[in-house]
Amino acid sequence: MIAIPQCLDFADARLTKDICEFYLRMLEIKNREIYLHSQQVANYSASTAAKLGLPASEVSQIKTAALLHDIGQLSVPNIILAKLPFLSTREQSIYKRHCIAGASMLENIPGFDTISDIIRAHHEKWDGTGYPKRLKGQNIPIGARIVAVPTIMTATLTPAPGIGKKLTPTLSSSCRTRQASILIRQ
């Protein structure tokens, strides 16, 4: 489900939906694992936002941002994506640009300011060690904090590309606990 801002007329809303579906289709063609990961993140994010009691319109925006959170990976060379998580410093620098690239793809679409802000900040961490802007605490949009948790959770519970193995349950739990502690205030 793609959230269409209510301020748009029917023609703009249809165009906006088509643009989002186009980006999702391109992501699916480029890397099906990332596309499926985005679907999982969207479902978990929407569920979390709803359980937090956020308004339905905000839940819908968070779900759309979660669906599109990795569209910036369309700009990352396949050879780098295939090596995840084992990247050189240079490759990490290229990979980390996907947040800004994804936000840039949507920020000029009417009504998508919040969604592009969430996409830009989905790798920020509560303690300020995230990227791309090293935002800290309450400066990270709530939607980005919500999207960040299932992003890490699904990444630790599914096989790593090229490895074909999941993390062990103990290691996976340890990773989630550590990551959650720097994503949300304790």
What is the role of each PLM region?
Residues 1-186:
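Histidine- and acidic-residue-rich, metal-dependent catalytic cores
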